[in-house]
């Protein structure tokens, strides 16, 4: 019972870490990245669609994203969606392609982004700790029902704590890396 429990907890913790990395990918740094536009939804063909399903995106230079729609009729909708996405971007449409220049981040904006990144990391740490709590409760319930011995419960609790510590460390490493990217001028 205990080994599958540990594997299940680690899978759940891994999902939390993956969700954090997805959120971090949408946080703007000084360099252009197509992942910045992943959350943009375009009103295309009568429904809301992710930008990457109606256009291809490239990064021709460090602070520019080019969005090439597959249907030129969607240029206006794509430009409007990027402008309305509240990313602080000002796209321009030249009739063939939507160019999205990334303005230089101010020191104040960088600090705001670092605060946002820390908020994301704290939410992820809370999720990991809740997963740990679920695991320990499961172990205590199993011990109470005489499914495992008290020694086995303590051994497994240590394994759960080690997994938790490992994932908290991975979260911290991801945050330090993202913070360095944001603060780099």
Swiss-Prot record:
The keyword Protein biosynthesis applies. GO terms for cellular component: cytosol. SUPFAM superfamilies: Ribosome recycling factor, RRF (SSF55194). It holds the Pfam family RRF. GO terms for molecular function: ribosomal large subunit binding. InterPro entries: Ribosome_recyc_fac, Ribosome_recyc_fac_dom, RRF_sf. It is found in: Cytoplasm. Keywords: Cytoplasm, Protein biosynthesis. GO terms for biological process: cytoplasmic translational termination. Belongs to the RRF family. HAMAP family: RRF. Responsible for the release of ribosomes from messenger RNA at the termination of protein biosynthesis. May increase the efficiency of translation by recycling ribosomes from one round of translation to another. This is Ribosome-recycling factor. The lineage of its organism: Bacteria, Pseudomonadati, Pseudomonadota, Alphaproteobacteria, Magnetococcales. The gene is frr.
